[in-house]
């Protein structure tokens, strides 16, 4: 998307684009659609360039579509003429009125396995019907679709009374910090909940508040977690500055991630 580089998060509040506190998508998810199905729908138009700023001619025939400059549209190399080349990279498909994603949804793409499982657990607990409907379409994206230049959870595991959480520590994240940091970054406020469950019944919850050094911290470990006698599953939720970043489940008997 046009602002993905800046908005893909979690971005520290002091690094957000133009100081906008809302310029932050903590856990990005992409919907991938079947192009042939999209183009075959009634009332679908397409443009070779972005419609922003006065727009570009809208087309709706196969002949017009075949004349598009796809070398520019799919070009991911360094831009020589930013203003012009960016317009091509924002080519659009447009439909009139509401659009039902079910008509041509191909996949729902997540950044990594932790975020995939988080989405599945949210759907399963909040909307079982949606979980059944979309679970087979939710996948980890294997392509270079995400910027990976913010803070996110890369691993979350429990073993022998200890929980280990790993944070992203990518070159892209460090580069973004170096480019846009103007002042010392305050620690982020976070909460982790450990829910011990048996047959969907909550037996015990342990909650801990902690802080995260956005620049340097690669992980955190929690010890002294006492498993209740009848607990069969441990659900772990991590919330950073009010945003749910991780929702993992682990079967305690079989040590399998849910």
Describe each model-derived feature in a short phrase.
Residues 2-211, 218-219, 223, 230-237, ...:
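Active-site-proximal loop/hinge segments that shape catalytic or ion-binding/gating pockets
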Residues 257-258:
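A positional/architectural concept
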């Amino acid at each position: 998307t046009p602002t993905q580089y800046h908005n893909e998060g979690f971005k520290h509040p002091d690094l957000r684009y133009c100081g906008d506190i809302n310029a932050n998508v903590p856990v990005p998810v992409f919907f991938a659609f079947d192009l042939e199905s999209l183009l075959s729908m009634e009332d679908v138009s397409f443009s070779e360039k972005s419609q922003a700023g006065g727009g570009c001619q809208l087309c709706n025939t196969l002949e017009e579509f075949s004349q598009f400059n796809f070398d520019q549209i799919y070009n991911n190399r360094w831009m020589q003429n930013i203003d012009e080349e960016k317009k091509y990279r924002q080519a659009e498909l447009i439909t009139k009125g509401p659009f039902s994603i079910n008509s041509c949804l191909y996949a729902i793409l997540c950044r990594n396995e932790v975020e995939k499982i988080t989405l599945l657990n949210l759907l399963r607990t909040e909307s079982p019907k949606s979980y059944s409907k979309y679970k087979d379409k939710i996948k980890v994206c294997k392509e270079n679709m995400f910027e990976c230049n913010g803070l996110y959870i890369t691993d979350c595991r429990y073993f022998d009374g200890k929980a280990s959480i790993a944070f992203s520590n990518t070159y892209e994240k460090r580069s973004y910090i170096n480019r846009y940091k103007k002042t010392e970054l305050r620690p982020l406020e976070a909460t982790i909940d450990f829910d011990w469950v048996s047959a969907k019944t909550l037996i015990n919850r342990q909650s801990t508040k902690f802080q995260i050094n956005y620049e340097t911290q690669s992980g955190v470990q929690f010890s002294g977690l006492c498993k209740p006698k009848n607990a069969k599953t441990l659900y772990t939720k991590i919330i950073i500055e009010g945003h749910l970043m991780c929702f993992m489940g682990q079967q305690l008997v079989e040590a399998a991630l849910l």
